[in-house]
């Protein structure tokens, strides 16, 4: 194959690779978000579980999204369990491979593990604090109230 032909072949394939990378996170969870807006948390949870993988590349988003659904349902303890997992996942994903990052950037951001943006890491602790305040409000005795506030 001639050098010019190789260059043209690569030039023709590059847009295909880049366009394949345009799949967005939002397309997979639109239905779940709509259910949250309607207050149908059970349906939303099922759709998030179907759209996101708890052990795959989007495991951070899986735990964060479900934690918010649990928070909105008023299940503050379950929300905190999910947020604790999300926090550990975010910390584990802090270290990334340069090669893996370049390949992910060139193809599809959802092909590599998502480590979360800085504001999302703050979001984890913000919701944990809200959950502890919610637990304090639901506490039936003084010790439960203080234990929940101490967690915040």
Question: Which ranges hold each PLM region?
Answer:
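Inward-facing hydrophobic residues that define packing positions of alpha-helical scaffold repeats
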Residues: 48-49, 83, 90, 145, ...
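Residue signature of alpha-solenoid helical repeat architecture, marking inter-repeat boundaries
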Residues: 57, 118-119, 126
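Bacterial Sec signal peptide processing site at the extreme N-terminus
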Residues: 20-43, 50-54
């Amino acid at each position: 194959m001639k050098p010019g032909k190789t260059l043209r072949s690569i030039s023709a394939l590059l847009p295909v690779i880049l366009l394949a990378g345009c799949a967005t996170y939002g397309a997979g969870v639109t239905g779940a978000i709509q259910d949250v807006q309607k207050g149908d948390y059970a349906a939303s949870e099922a759709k998030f579980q179907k759209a996101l993988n708890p052990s795959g590349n989007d495991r951070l988003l899986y735990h964060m999204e479900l934690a918010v659904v649990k928070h909105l349902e008023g299940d503050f303890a379950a929300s905190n369990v999910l947020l604790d997992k999300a926090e550990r996942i975010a910390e584990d994903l802090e270290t990334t491979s340069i090669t893996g990052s370049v390949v992910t950037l060139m193809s599809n951001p959802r092909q590599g593990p998502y480590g979360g943006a800085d504001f999302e890491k703050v979001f984890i602790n913000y919701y944990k604090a809200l959950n502890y305040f919610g637990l304090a409000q639901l506490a039936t005795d003084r010790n439960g109230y203080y234990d929940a506030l101490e967690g915040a």
